[in-house]
Curated annotation (Swiss-Prot):
Subcellular location: Cell membrane
Motif (WSXWS motif): 213-217
Protein name: Interleukin-4 receptor subunit alpha
Organism in which the protein naturally occurs: Mus musculus
Pfam families: IL4Ra_N
Length: 810
């Protein structure tokens, strides 16, 4: 029995030893941390150096210090972790002045001792009932509950912190501090990303009392979704549009192509109908600018061709701009000044008409600028273009009348009718009508005719005046004037040879003293009808140039003799006429050398030629009018036969134009209806030729005088052959022509000798003859005329002084 008591005492001793050994080994790491919720509970927490069972080994004793008789309160801690002990102490309605004394015991050993004030260490309670409201249209509303009563100090002293973060990425969050009293937070929906899950939580803290943030409230989660604004949807819309528009265009292209191939191409179109005809003329372009079809097709883009096929009804044909030729400046077209110039352009269109309508012509013209040429090529091109501007080569351009020309012709006809009625009514009004100018073969010069009544017998004479070609309009066309008026053509006289002279009219009798000269009567009539106006550009001409030599005086005498041959008696012979002309010229101007009555060795062969002329005149008197002196061009022996060949001794210069349908007399035309035109150049008065019935017959007296003229005239220089003897060395100097040896005086006669040599005038024109003004043509232009039987020679306008009658034809 004693043995049992010994075993019990040994066991109790070991237990006490273990307890003492164990209690001495617990150690607190630092001071405990205490904080209060300032409503009912204060919490203390401390850390130990080793794992300890807090509830069995440790004990916390605390008591209120301000009351002397306050009781000690004990708190049993618990383990929050293996080395962390937490103890929750109950406090009844704490105030700011409360202070507690605290002691930590490990069995019978004190581990820590200190004090704690609840108002200095406040940790508010975590909010609860966190809610998100979505009933607001554009904002989120987040609410929570305040756990402090209204009588508590922390009810109005708490601030809140709201944390909103993505559920999938908590590091991306947004924090809102709520400083107002109400436990709520409102934020816009679009501040968060749409289509994302978000979580929210809240914690509070006292603003007045010292303390820390409360624990986080339980979190809530929601799905954020809203309609994006337009500015945020614009990039997406632009991207989608950039992708959809090309796809749509491609779809439309292939769809329209498919539909056109299946449906549109199967519909009959007027373009394939036989009722349509298109005649395209070749483009009038230079050869170097013409392009082949392959070159033109390469310049037309392929996409335009496809567009033409897709939308044929919406496309219009192209019209090219007007272009001018580079040679338009030196070569001007012959057109009316009152009308705009004809400019070709490309006109390409389709014409529809019924089957019974004639085919229309669509003219397609294209102009290309010629490349730059040198000076010689430009001169050759100008010559070619001048030749191509003739009526035959103009290609339908033609000469057109302008309104001004038509009015001028009507005015002339009106004045002619009035003058005829005033002078006793000279038969028919056709005598006053002016014949249209007959264009020459080259289109560069024209001959104008005028009707000139000749006294009571109503005979008419013809005068031809040169009308050089110019860019202005012509007075008419041959097709209009030839059938209506009968124009008798006087033998043409070429005005290019200064040695072409006549002296037969020097023997004509002088007019009576009381009677005016025929040229003065004509001048009076012309002044009454149409006084020249200095402002009129048609009536005014270039200033008169004085006659340069006595040979021109002789030439005008020939013209006067041809005009007065029908009314004056025939002279005895050509040599006597020449002597009288020379005497008269020497008497009026004795200072002119080379003009002597007789004895000039240059005319010794003249009398022998006159003898043959007299014999021929006797033999030919049966068929012709004898006694007409002066040299005239050759005429056909038979009027209705073709003209004979040109004699060799005339050098092709002194023959008349062969009759043609344009200038021949129509059948059954009375001589009094001959259409003539009086040509006035530079204000000079021109005498009319003799009447048609007094004109000498062909080959009456012309052959002999032609031989005389050919013998006396040098065909190289155009002057009379004068070979002076040795005794003439003391007279005025004589100039020898280069290349032929003919001598001629280099001094020109004075104006007095010129007018004196022309005093004798024919009496064939009666004083009462009425004159009408010819259509006015510009006198500053010259042309080049060609006629059958004549070689082309440059035309020269002969300047005729006042009182002289001249016929100048180019």
């Amino acid at each position: 029995m004693g043995r049992l008591c010994t075993k019990f005492l040994t066991s109790v001793g070991c237990l006490i030893l273990l307890l003492v050994t164990g209690s001495g080994s617990i150690k607190v790491l630092g001071e405990p941390t205490c904080f209060s919720d300032y409503i009912r509970t204060s919490t203390c927490e401390w850390f130990l150096d080793s794992a300890v069972d807090c509830s069995s080994q440790l004990c916390l004793h605390y008591r209120l210090m301000f009351f002397e008789f306050s009781e000690n309160l004990t708190c049993i801690p618990r383990n929050s972790a293996s080395t962390v002990c937490v103890c929750h102490m109950e406090m009844n309605r704490p105030v700011q002045s409360d202070r507690y004394q605290m002691e930590l015991w490990a069995e019978h050993r004190q581990l820590w001792q200190g004090s704690f004030s609840p108002s200095g260490n406040v940790k508010p309670l975590a909010p609860d009932n966190l809610t998100l409201h979505t009933n607001v249209s554009d904002e989120w509303l987040l609410t929570w509950n305040n756990l402090y009563p209204s009588n508590n100090l922390l009810y109005k002293d708490l601030i809140s912190m709201v944390n909103i973060s993505r559920e999938d990425n908590p590091a991306e969050f947004i924090v809102y501090n709520v400083t107002y009293k109400e436990p709520r937070l409102s934020f816009p929906i679009n501040i968060l990303m749409s289509g994302v899950y978000y979580t929210a939580r809240v914690r509070v803290r006292s603003q007045i009392l010292t303390g820390t943030w409360s624990e986080w409230s339980p979190s809530i989660t929601w799905y954020n979704h809203f309609q994006l604004p337009l500015i945020q949807r614009l990039p997406l819309g632009v991207t989608i549009s950039c992708l959809c528009i090309p796809l749509f265009c491609l779809f439309c292209y292939f769809s329209i192509t498919k539909i056109k191939k299946i449906w549109w191409d199967q519909i009959p179109t007027p373009a394939r109908s036989p009722l349509v005809a298109i005649i395209i003329q070749d483009a009038q372009v230079p050869l170097w600018d013409k392009q082949t079809r392959s070159q033109e097709s390469t310049k037309y883009p392929h996409w335009k061709t496809c567009l033409d096929k897709l939308l044929p009804c919406l496309l219009k044909h192209r019209v090219k701009k007007k272009t001018d030729f580079p040679k338009a400046a030196p070569t001007k077209s012959l057109q009316s000044p009152g009308k705009a110039g004809w400019c070709p352009m490309e006109v390409s269109r389709t014409v529809l008409w019924p089957e019974n309508v004639s085919v229309s012509v669509v003219r397609c013209m294209e102009l290309f600028e010629a490349p730059v040429q040198n000076v010689e090529e430009e001169e050759d091109e100008i010559v070619k273009e001048d030749l191509s501007m003739s009526p035959e080569n103009s290609g339908g351009c033609g000469f057109q009348e302008s309104q001004a020309d038509i009015m001028a012709r009507l005015t002339e006809n009106l004045f002619s009718d009035l003058l005829e009625a005033e002078n006793g009514g000279l038969g028919q009004s056709a005598l006053a009508e002016s014949c249209s100018p007959l264009p020459s073969g080259s289109g560069q010069a024209s001959v104008s005719w005028a009707c000139l009544p000749m006294g009571p017998s109503e005979e008419a004479t013809c005068q031809v005046t040169e009308q050089p070609s110019h860019p202005g309009p012509l007075s008419g066309s041959p097709a209009q004037s030839a059938p209506t008026l009968a124009c008798t053509q006087v033998p043409l006289v070429l005005a290019d040879n200064p040695a072409y002279r006549s002296f037969s009219d020097c023997c004509s009798p002088a007019p009576n003293p009381g009677e005016l000269a025929p040229e003065q009567q004509q001048a009076d009539h012309l002044e009454e009808e149409e006084p020249p106006s200095p402002a009129d550009p048609h009536s005014s001409g270039p200033p008169m140039q004085p006659v340069e030599s006595w040979e021109q005086i002789l030439h005008m005498s020939v013209l006067q003799h041809g005009a007065a041959a029908g009314s004056t008696p025939a002279p005895a012979g050509g040599y006597q006429e020449f002597v009288q002309a020379v005497k008269q010229g020497a008497a009026q101007d004795p200072g002119v050398p080379g003009v002597r009555p007789s004895g000039d060795p240059g005319y010794k062969a003249f009398s022998s030629l006159l003898s043959s002329n007299g014999i021929r005149g006797d033999t030919a008197a049966a068929g012709t009018d004898d006694g007409h002196g002066g040299y005239k061009p050759f005429q056909n022996p038979v009027p209705n036969q073709s003209p004979s060949s040109v004699p060799l001794f005339t050098f092709g210069l002194d023959t008349e134009l062969s009759p043609s349908p344009l200038n021949s007399d129509p059948p059954k035309s009375p001589p009094e209806c001959l259409g003539l035109e009086l040509g006035l150049k530079g204000g000079d008065w021109v005498k009319a030729p003799p009447p048609a019935d007094q004109v000498p017959k062909p080959f009456g007296d012309d052959l002999g005088f032609g031989i005389v003229y050919s013998s006396l005239t040098c065909h190289l220089c155009g002057h009379l052959k004068q070979h002076h003897s040795q005794e003439e060395g003391g007279q005025s100097p004589i100039v020898a022509s280069p290349g032929c040896g003919c001598c001629y005086d280099d001094r020109s006669p004075s104006l007095g000798s010129l007018s004196g040599a022309l005093e004798s005038c024919p009496e064939g024109i009666p004083p009462e003859a009425n004159l009408m003004s010819a259509p006015k043509t510009p006198s500053n232009l010259s042309g080049e005329g060609k006629g059958p039987g004549h070689s082309p020679v440059p035309s020269q306008t002969t300047e005729v002084p006042v009182g002289a009658l001249g016929i100048a034809v180019s």
